[in-house]
Amino acid sequence: MAENKWLRNGFVWIVLIIAVVALWVTFMKDGGSAREENFADVAADIRQGRVARIVMTEGSNDIQVQYIGEEEPRSSRLPPDVNIYQALEQYGLSGADVEIRVNPASQWGNWLSALTFILPTLFLIGIVIFMMRQAQGTNNQAISFGKSRARMFTGNKPTVTFADVAGVEEAKEELVEVVEFLKYPDKFASLGARIPRGVLLVGPPGTGKTLLSRAVAGEAGVPFFSISGSEFVEMFVGVGASRVRDLFDQAKRNAPCIVFIDEIDAVGRQRGAGLGGSHDEREQTLNQILVEMDGFDSTTNVIVIAATNRPDVLDPALLRPGRFDRQVVLDRPDIAGRRAILEVHSRGKPLESDVDLEELARQTPGFSGADLENLVNEAAILAARRNKKTIGRRELTEAIDRVIAGPERKSRVLSEREKLMTAYHEAGHALVARMLPHADPVHKVSIVARGMMGGYTRVLPEEDRFFWTKKQFEDQLAVFMGGHVAEELVFQEISTGAANDIERATNLARRMVTEYGMSKTLGPLAFGRKEELVFLGREINEQRNYSDEVAYMIDQEIRSLIDTAYKRAHEILSQHMDKLEAIAMLLMEAETIDGHELEALFDEPRPRPQLVGPPVTRPAALAHKTEEADRGGERSPHPQPHPSPTMRPQPAS
């Protein structure tokens, strides 16, 4: 391949050299830029004695006329079919009237004359040949569409190992066995174990699916083929299936090895009903993947690792055992995982002594591994921008704000009234969050514009949360209403600054009613059917599966939740107007305050949630009570279930 490329480039250079030589020969033949005279004028000048000599080449009609007092000769041309002497006689002159020098003909002159015609011809022929080769290359390129575009990485020099992956310990444990399968296949074959055909990595974007697959290849020390699912399908029919065959042929020749298909949902979506033919090419590609992963030839030592963040749209045939035997879930890391990830990404970066990675991990709930890597990188960029040699807490804290809300918009200048309204708006959020027991503690309040926001109030949960309760949602709704209510109380008007808060509150209230079953009137029911459309690759489309009367009740429940949240926020802010003003004035002065500065304004501690639940009975005590009841001949009756509010018993008529 490299040799053909060199020959092709060399041919282009040859054509260019021929063109340059042809131009040079043409220029030399024209004799440069000498002044040209008519021979009749030259004869008149000879008669007047102004010409010193005439120089010419034997066999040529071109002459050089040297005038007296001039350094450069002038060029002229003899009449056709006569020599210099005959031409002079035509004007009544002879060779005695002027000095004539005749130089012998040079062989180079004949060559130059020949090249004048040969080189342009060769140049045109070269252009034709070049165009023919380009056309041939286009045909070869069309044929090469069927070749796989997978990039191969050898396992001789692993760049990524399990030591570079943190925060996904369970996933690493699952994939350690894959490494052992590749390193010691006889260990499992002796027990009759079948080597897993494929591993599917499932998780949100940025959780380390691609990094983990590269670490598996680095640990196993085997070749690693990497390709994206979108690289299989092209505009030509059959290209996708051909590329799949070529990819697995390369993998079998380099076995044992790993084939990594990123974003497999691009070709692995569930096959439709076969009507219309809009997805036939993608389905042919998927069918070929199914055959290659578990067809008649199932003895090769090739393991397929695929990654996706849409497992719900994948074809069931792709997920069955024998193809993707294991599905490894990579979720966003918890606080311990975030700390481990921060330690990995802070290697080689000079951190100041006051940097606490544990505290940093606590401040970044919901961050993925990619977010944390970006955070550390942003902090390093900020430190370099400030000409510092180390990365401090200030840079890391600001990097968190940049990742969450975007960079500061220092060019955005607010009027004094808008700035004051923003301060009271954010103070309303912060005060309501501080006074409600089930709301998350306030970590930072700022009126500095970032991204699309004029200001923001950042709350920070005290621990990682995997479930939400109704009381937490209700307090969250009240916090959303805090900014809107504060503007109304202080300025007796409302602004567009609360638009996003109202939208988020409405969406949360709707989900509480229609998805989470948190409505007393409607009960624990889910409303809205998610229909899976086969023609769109199982795209989700929500349709109403309830009556207009129920839709009205849903709207009423949403309005009730929002109204209750509004009243709670209004009550809190009305009772603590002095605190609201103090927070707003502090924001006007400092623009940004943290949770400790906010707590310093209060004398009483922050209200804590009261845990209410049944007394915990240990299994042994429960068994003892059951035995006593059996001996007494009585069993403790089960409590009767309360009727659902929507299913109240009707009185007998």
Curated annotation (Swiss-Prot):
GO terms for biological process: protein catabolic process; proteolysis. Gene3D superfamilies: 1.10.8.60, P-loop containing nucleotide triphosphate hydrolases, Peptidase M41. It comes from the Bacteria. Residues 30-110 are extracellular. Residues 624-637 have a biased composition (Basic and acidic residues). Keywords: ATP-binding, Cell membrane, Hydrolase, Membrane, Metal-binding, Metalloprotease, Nucleotide-binding, Protease, Transmembrane, Transmembrane helix, Zinc. It is a multi-pass membrane protein. It is found in: Cell membrane. GO terms for molecular function: ATP binding; ATP hydrolysis activity; ATP-dependent peptidase activity; metalloendopeptidase activity; zinc ion binding. The chain crosses the membrane at residues 9-29, 111-131. Residues 638-653 have a biased composition (Pro residues). InterPro entries: AAA+_ATPase (IPR003593), AAA_lid_3 (IPR041569), ATPase_AAA_core (IPR003959), ATPase_AAA_CS (IPR003960), FtsH (IPR005936), P-loop_NTPase (IPR027417), Peptidase_M41 (IPR000642), Peptidase_M41-like (IPR037219). Its EC number is 3.4.24.-. Residues 1-8, 132-653 are cytoplasmic. ATP binds at G203, P204, P205, G206, T207, G208, K209, T210. Residues 604-653 are annotated as: Disordered. In the central section; belongs to the AAA ATPase family. In the C-terminal section; belongs to the peptidase M41 family. Homohexamer. HAMAP family: FtsH. Acts as a processive, ATP-dependent zinc metallopeptidase for both cytoplasmic and membrane proteins. Plays a role in the quality control of integral membrane proteins. This is ATP-dependent zinc metalloprotease FtsH 1. It comes from Sphaerobacter thermophilus (strain ATCC 49802 / DSM 20745 / KCCM 41009 / NCIMB 13125 / S 6022).
